[in-house]
Amino acid sequence: MKKLYILFCLLTMVLLTADAQRRYLDQMFPVVRTADVVYGKNISILTGMPAAEDLKVDIYTPAGDAKTDRPLVLISHTGSFLPPLYNGQVTGARTDSTVINIAAALASRGFVVGCYTYRLGWLPTSPDQNARTGTLLQAAYRGIQDTRSCIRYFKKSVAEDGNPYGIDPSKVCLWGIGTGGYLALGSGCVNDWSEVTLPKFINTQTLLPFIDSTLLGNLYATTQTPLCLPNHPAYSSNFQISINMGGALGDSSWLDGEAIEPTYAGVHCTSDFFAPFYEGPVIVPTTNQFVIYATGTRKCIETANNLGSNDILKTVDPNLDVLKNLIDGQKSTQTILPLTQQNILLGTDNFYAFDIPIIYNGKVVPQGSPWEWWDLNTLKVIVQIVNAQRGTNFNADTLHLNGLATNPDMSANKGRAYIDTTLRLALPRMCVSLNLGCQAVAIEEVDDAVIGLNLGPIPAKSEVRFETKAEYPIESIHVYDLNGNLVKAHTDINANRYVMPRHSLQPGFYLAQLKTKDKLVTKQIIFND
């Protein structure tokens, strides 16, 4: 028993100091990729005939890393809610060069990264404005549903499946690229039904909302309807920080500063033709037609700053924030946006503007995704295979030129440079939002009597009950085995009583770390048969 007590004390000290590492800023690990993991199943309308579709995620992990409570980043790709090639673009999949590069950069720093696919399909070529707007909103709605299902899949894997990916479900980041940015933003703030039934989201002919929950399911895809299957509904869809690269938000009123909302940071190009920098029309590359008036990254981040959602980001260590002086300069720079002629300040806190000149080689060339790149020879092979298999007539040269139209000097070096700048913005803010220990965070380790903790039974067979004083609601419970591995976690509890099921835990001794707002208690629990 004395040896067990010493082990308990040593392990407790390890758990308390593990988050003090600053490893999430520098590349340290080789990266392992596990492809085509199914995180859920839902109804797709892509072919015109509703049918169940497997939703997949590629998971990138730091090889040789012993930690089991790592932060999770979920990356959503671009693509205009249509498959690559069909969208008139080269990109639009979780295997895009940009997606893979960001995933590898994050995993090499100690993050676990999931690059996920969401349901696609809408009517971009319809001559009917209502059809274009309505089906695009429905596509974005499905994408937000799938994003939330993906979050819940990973939380379930910790609570029920023994934490196979070694993550802490209370440290989740959404990272959206282009179209994926709509999901990273929307998944953070679309929490009320009234937000998707604003007048701009009403069919002007039928006077009915474009979004019908009796068909599409609720905001979280936790209800079953003709076009929605629930996935992992017992778990929270909450996450802690949203990073956006060139996406937009359906309406700025969706941001309302609720406690449930994450922090927000992002980048955007001033001459983006397809998504507004500040606010303006959304134009889809497939047809270059207007779809909806939306709020761009610059205004989204400013709104989040003003509402208090980003207050915690005021504590970002200036020694880590290498873009701080540049951001401060943009905050005092008055600019006229080249496409909308809006006269605004170029910058705001937690945002970086890529102010790319709209004139390139004497011609007007708006650029919105300079972080993208592709290989023409590889594209030709892919197009040949797709045409042979599906009877299509895509032309690789045409697709290549479509891409160059808004990225004329496209190259891997250029793309990586823009990604590197985005990482410099994101990483110090992820450190704070995810409480990664890149800097000190005020939380006190206390005795169980301080928070009035009662737990039992000990030993337990199927579940353990945790209770605290009214003024100390439980935020999360993390369970570690005696080797220090995180084997179970329950987050977003926010209650004074919680019954934790055993699920797949083997008989033996464990340490339960219970966290309230500013207190931490570690207690031993035992399961037997």
Predicted regions and their residues:
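C-terminal outer-membrane/trafficking sorting elements
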Residues: D447-D529
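Bacterial Sec-dependent N-terminal signal peptides
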Residues: M1-Y24, C438-E444, I458, N485, ...
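Short beta-strand element of the alpha/beta-hydrolase
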Residues: D69-G79
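N-terminal cap/lid segment of alpha/beta-hydrolase-fold proteins
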Residues: Q21-T68
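C-terminal catalytic histidine-bearing segment of alpha/beta-hydrolase fold enzymes
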Residues: N305-Q439
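Cap/lid segment of the alpha/beta-hydrolase catalytic domain
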Residues: S80-D96, F111-Y141, D397
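The feature captures the conserved acid-bearing segment of alpha/beta-hydrolase catalytic domains
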Residues: T206-I312, D321
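Gly/Ser-rich "nucleophile elbow"/oxyanion-hole loop immediately N-terminal to the catalytic nucleophile
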Residues: T68, A131-Q145, S149-G178, W193-L198
